[in-house]
């Protein structure tokens, strides 16, 4: 599906004073002509596909804007399947902006929309939709495990899984439709065996959905709030988990007067630890502001660690804090100071540890991952994203309805209705059955330049 216009955008992250090199990407019929117009190459350098040339970008008054390398990739041997030019210029906001503005002033060139390069790759058959989504997920990966799963998708893991399941359903649909049209000429169809095969596909789809939900923790990370009355060791626990002195640790109540954050990775899961100010009654205006932010962190956390003083035991303040945790948010009761004699608790705690000595830390990590559904991701080969999970769940529901049709002993043509729906949903995962409007919605979530 050749495009009539040429798009351009910065394909690398740009920040003030950061990054030695930036890449400006062009794709479309005017890409090569634009590259030749914008980049002036000294000497007799040979232009060719997949060759690099050296030159300068010059403004309308003949002044050099930047020293660059240009890489031409003629279609269809390119990411988008179209003629693609990459201009490698110096990094930094100003240098990149000047070169991009020069590119966008050329005839037939416009600024790319978010995800438009990947969308063209899909429309031109260079990528299936799951691989295109994996590119975006690889760029956004916040941990090595998330990057590994994204690479599995980029290598075709998701596409292969879904294609196999879809082909199994297509085989069954072929059998059913043959019986509808030529039942008298064919041997009887074993409906029970057919149902077993549909049930097997449904169970595999449901497992993919469950794995994908765990994969979300790897992609998006978790927000974990450390809550407790003052001086129970929340800041010590934050420092223990993050392996650095992120919070000031003293024996004075109210030392943490604001919300502190620390980014860590536990068992491949990116986690934002929120060390909240001790929630208590106070006349200190600054501390009151920190407490208000702590309460907001409670409402937005994926899981709450209620840190208790294991030496002092359970108090009325602990009970009040437990009651303030929203009911729908998982919570873990952590008795800190396990290196000291234990106090009394009216209910069992989930984890006993010493933030100072490190004992019990592994138990806390395991409890945290299990409570938020992020445990057991090591054996996962692929992880469906939200869009893919919704479609896989829709296919599984359609297959469940086919069992209801069988129970009612309806004719074969009734079976085909839900089977076609399941096949269509799986085709939407890989992009085999998608409208351009749906593609626009999918790629609008991508970064510009991807």
UniProtKB/Swiss-Prot annotation:
Protein's job: Exhibits a very high intrinsic GTPase hydrolysis rate. Involved in the addition of a carboxymethylaminomethyl (cmnm) group at the wobble position (U34) of certain tRNAs, forming tRNA-cmnm(5)s(2)U34.
GO cellular component terms attached to this protein's record: cytosol
Name of the protein: tRNA modification GTPase MnmE
Residues binding Mg(2+): 235, 256
Transmembrane segments: none
Family indicated by similarity: Belongs to the TRAFAC class TrmE-Era-EngA-EngB-Septin-like GTPase superfamily. TrmE GTPase family.
Principal localisation: cytoplasm
UniProt KW keywords: Cytoplasm, GTP-binding, Hydrolase, Magnesium, Metal-binding, Nucleotide-binding, Potassium, tRNA processing
Binding site for GTP: 231-236, 250-256, 275-278, 336-339
Protein's cellular compartments: Cytoplasm
UniProt-listed GO biological process terms: tRNA methylation; tRNA wobble uridine modification
Binding site for K(+): 231, 250, 252, 255
GO molecular function: GTP binding; GTPase activity; metal ion binding
TrmE-type G domain ranges (all copies): 221-373
Cofactor(s) the record lists: K(+)
Gene: mnmE
Positions bound to (6S)-5-formyl-5,6,7,8-tetrahydrofolate: 25, 86, 126, 450
Cofactor details (free text): Binds 1 potassium ion per subunit.
EC number: 3.6.-.-
Subunit structure and binding partners: Homodimer. Heterotetramer of two MnmE and two MnmG subunits.
Enzyme class: hydrolase
């Amino acid at each position: 599906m050749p495009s009539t216009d040429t798009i351009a955008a910065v394909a690398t992250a740009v920040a003030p004073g950061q990054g030695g090199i930036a890449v400006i990407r062009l794709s479309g019929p005017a890409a090569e002509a634009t590259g030749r117009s914008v980049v002036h190459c000294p000497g007799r350098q040979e232009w060719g596909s997949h060759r690099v040339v050296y030159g300068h970008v010059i403004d309308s008054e003949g002044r050099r804007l930047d020293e660059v390398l240009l890489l031409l990739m003629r279609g269809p041997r390119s990411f988008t399947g179209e003629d693609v030019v990459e201009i490698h210029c110096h990094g930094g906001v100003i240098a990149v902006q000047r070169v991009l503005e020069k590119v966008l002033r050329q005839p037939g060139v416009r600024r790319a929309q978010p995800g438009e390069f990947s969308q063209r790759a899909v429309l031109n058959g260079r990528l299936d939709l799951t691989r295109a989504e994996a590119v975006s997920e690889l760029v956004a990966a916040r941990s090595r495990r998330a990057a590994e799963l994204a690479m599995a998708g980029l290598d075709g893991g998701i596409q292969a899984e879904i294609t196999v399941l879809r082909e199994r359903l297509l085989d069954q649909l072929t059998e059913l439709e043959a019986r509808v049209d030529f039942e008298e000429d064919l041997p009887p169809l074993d409906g029970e065996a057919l149902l077993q095969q549909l049930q097997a596909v449904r169970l595999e789809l449901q497992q993919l959905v469950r794995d994908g939900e765990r994969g979300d923790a790897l992609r998006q990370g978790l927000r974990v709030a450390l809550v407790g009355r003052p001086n129970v060791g929340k800041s010590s626990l934050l420092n223990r988990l993050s392996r650095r002195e992120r919070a000031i640790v003293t024996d004075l109540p109210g030392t943490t007067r604001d919300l502190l954050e620390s980014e860590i990775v536990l068992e491949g899961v990116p986690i934002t630890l929120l060390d909240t100010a001790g929630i208590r009654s106070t006349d200190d205006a600054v501390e009151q502001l920190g407490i208000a932010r702590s309460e907001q962190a409670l409402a937005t956390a994926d899981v709450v660690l209620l840190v208790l003083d294991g030496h002092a035991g359970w108090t009325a303040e602990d009970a009040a804090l437990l009651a303030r945790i929203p009911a729908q948010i998982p919570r873990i009761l952590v008795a800190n100071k396990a290196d000291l004699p234990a106090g009394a608790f009216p209910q069992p705690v989930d984890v006993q540890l010493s933030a100072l000595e490190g004992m019990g830390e592994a138990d806390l990590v395991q409890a945290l991952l299990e409570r938020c559904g992020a445990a057991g991701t090591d054996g996962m080969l692929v992880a469906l994203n939200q869009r893919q999970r919704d479609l896989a769940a829709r296919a599984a529901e359609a297959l469940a309805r086919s069992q209801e049709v069988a129970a009612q002993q309806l004719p074969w043509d009734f079976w085909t209705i839900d089977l076609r729906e399941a096949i269509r949903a799986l085709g939407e995962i890989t992009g085999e059955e998608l409208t351009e409007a749906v593609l626009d919605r999918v790629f609008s979530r991508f970064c510009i330049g991807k």
